[in-house]
């Protein structure tokens, strides 16, 4: 894989020349006017990296959901119904006074019935207590076989002593799945299997370092360590050629993003409803467009793709949005790496500083949580910062960020249209049609949106849907998604060379762009959050 042509897999098969026509010089009108023949939809769906990310993620989700579904007791509904009917029956048959009688007779009857009534009440209470103490807990049978290195303080072996079998399980699943996908796409499965153990070992090392208790307290997440591990290798001894078949940055991250779609449930938007939607969906596009305009017109950043990726990274939701946008605008690996580095650095700073600022300003937890959710890039960092302010702030912050995450697909789609229609179009040439926009559109976004809709429906309308979906996510797919992201960050580091990155840092313009854009984001998000949560919908969201 050549780091200078990272987009060859983003929207077309590997055996088709996707970039030569799109990236032709402005003077080559014939190339722009007559693009090469595009592959058929069937061939695209069987060889394209984006489509295979969807197929791989869909297979994993199907297996994960089926495992939880099959693991239910056959008589679960009967147990629940029987328990409920028993409680109701006991309450209804509890002895009561027979009716009016003489005063002395009533006293005698009351005395006789006191003990049975108390016993009946005690039985009902005990039944309810047992039901409360021993409810059926949905769990994924796959959970013991899927794990990541755990937390450790002094002894590094503590991180893997209890999770090594789960780590091995993840390795075998991803190795087998991606080897098969590579073979079907016309690549060498053997070359992938020879290199993948090293990439996976580096990802395990990143997880292991992030699990150290002091490191964890500062929320220095695995993504940062994975990048550093890869960068150290690529910028010192260099990335060995034999590793390149397993350095599949886009494939890993796209598969992880499709898995993420199952976690972004539309039904959960109702938790905050319109206030959160206004904060996330009105401010975000304004900040993105304004920041991109500022980078082009004021800072005059040479690379439009770098400008766009940084703008999306900062305004939408960090790394996931950066990668989706990079696929849509065909950004270079170095540009994506720079954007992610800026995002991770400022995420750590904002996660530590913003809760203190909110407390010092006397902002209440609801408003503070909404501010955190709309500004901090990483979902994990949002949750960590919200937890500092309390459970109420955590709930609001996480929900606003979840609402904002839905814009990943929308952003990628809009950027793809803008890029094909305006950025790469020759003004003297013919207007690019819908087919070219479809060809350039990152198809994995369709998987992200489809999984979000599908599992939202299952969550809302299926019997025991919330329990089933939560068990599936918590017991398997969330762990796999984390591994895919970690493998992607290791790959980004291995493909990034600082010598190629330095020209992009000339004059510090990317840093200035990020700081200015984030400053605008902070101001607009706070204003909108105040209007929505404290003025317009104050009664609705009041605790």
From Swiss-Prot:
Cellular component terms per the entry's GO annotation: plasma membrane
Assigned keywords, A-Z: Cell membrane, Membrane, Transmembrane, Transmembrane helix
Subcellular localization: Cell membrane
Membrane topology term: Multi-pass membrane protein
Bias type Low complexity, positions: 1-22
Family from the record: Belongs to the UPF0324 family.
Transmembrane segments: 51-73, 160-182, 189-211, 221-243, 270-292, 307-329, 336-358, 368-390, 403-422, 437-459, 479-496, 511-533
Recorded coiled-coil stretches: none
Region (Disordered): 1-41, 91-120
Name of the featured protein: UPF0324 membrane protein RB9488
């Amino acid at each position: 894989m050549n780091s200078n042509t990272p987009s060859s897999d983003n929207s077309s098969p590997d055996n088709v020349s996707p970039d030569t026509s799109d990236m032709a010089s402005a003077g080559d009108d014939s190339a722009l006017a007559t693009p090469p023949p595009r592959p058929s939809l069937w061939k695209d769906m069987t060889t394209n990296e984006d489509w295979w990310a969807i197929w791989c993620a869909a297979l994993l989700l199907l297996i994960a959901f089926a495992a939880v579904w099959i693991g239910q007791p056959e008589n679960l509904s009967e147990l629940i119904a029987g328990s409920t009917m028993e409680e109701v029956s006991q309450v209804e048959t509890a002895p009561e006074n027979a009716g009016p009688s003489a005063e002395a007779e009533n006293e005698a009857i009351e005395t006789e019935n006191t003990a049975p009534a108390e016993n009946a009440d005690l039985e009902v209470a005990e039944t309810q207590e047992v039901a409360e103490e021993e409810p059926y807990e949905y769990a994924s049978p796959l959970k013991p076989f899927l794990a990541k290195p755990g937390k450790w303080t002094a002894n590094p072996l503590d991180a893997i002593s209890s999770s090594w079998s789960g780590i091995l399980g993840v390795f075998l699943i991803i190795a087998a799945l991606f080897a098969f996908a590579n073979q079907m796409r016309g690549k060498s499965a053997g070359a992938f299997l020879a290199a993948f153990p090293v990439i996976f070992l580096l990802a395990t090392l990143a997880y292991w370092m992030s699990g150290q208790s002091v490191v964890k307290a500062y929320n220095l997440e695995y993504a940062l360590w994975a990048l550093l591990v890869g960068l150290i290798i690529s910028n010192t001894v260099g990335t060995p050629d034999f590793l390149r078949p397993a350095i599949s940055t886009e494939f890993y991250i796209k598969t992880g993003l499709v898995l993420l779609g199952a976690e972004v449930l539309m039904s959960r938007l109702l938790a905050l409803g319109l206030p959160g939607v206004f904060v996330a969906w009105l401010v975000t596009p304004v900040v993105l467009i304004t920041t991109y305009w500022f980078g082009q017109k004021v800072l005059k950043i040479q690379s439009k793709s770098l400008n766009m990726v940084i703008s999306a990274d900062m305004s939408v939701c960090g790394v996931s949005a950066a990668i989706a946008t990079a696929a849509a605008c065909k950004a270079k690996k170095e540009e994506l790496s720079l954007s992610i580095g800026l995002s991770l650095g400022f995420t750590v700073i904002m996660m530590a500083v913003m809760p203190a600022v909110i407390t010092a300003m006397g902002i209440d937890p609801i408003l503070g949580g909404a501010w955190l959710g709309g500004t901090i890039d990483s979902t994990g960092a949002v949750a960590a910062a919200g937890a500092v302010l309390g459970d109420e702030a955590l709930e609001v912050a996480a929900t606003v960020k979840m609402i904002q995450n839905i814009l990943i697909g929308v952003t990628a789609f809009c950027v793809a249209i803008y890029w094909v229609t305006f950025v790469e179009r020759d003004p003297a040439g013919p207007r690019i049609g819908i087919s070219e926009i479809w060809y350039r559109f990152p198809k994995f976004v369709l998987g992200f949106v489809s999984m979000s809709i599908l599992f939202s429906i299952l969550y809302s309308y299926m019997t025991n849907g919330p329990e089933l979906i939560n068990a599936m996510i918590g017991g398997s797919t969330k762990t796999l998604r984390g591994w895919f992201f970690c493998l992607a960050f290791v790959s980004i580091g291995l493909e990034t060379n600082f010598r190629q990155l330095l020209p992009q840092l000339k004059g510090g313009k990317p840093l200035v762009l990020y700081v200015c854009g984030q400053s605008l984001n902070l101001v607009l998000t706070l204003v909108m959050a105040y209007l929505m949560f404290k003025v317009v919908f104050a009664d609705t969201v009041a605790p």
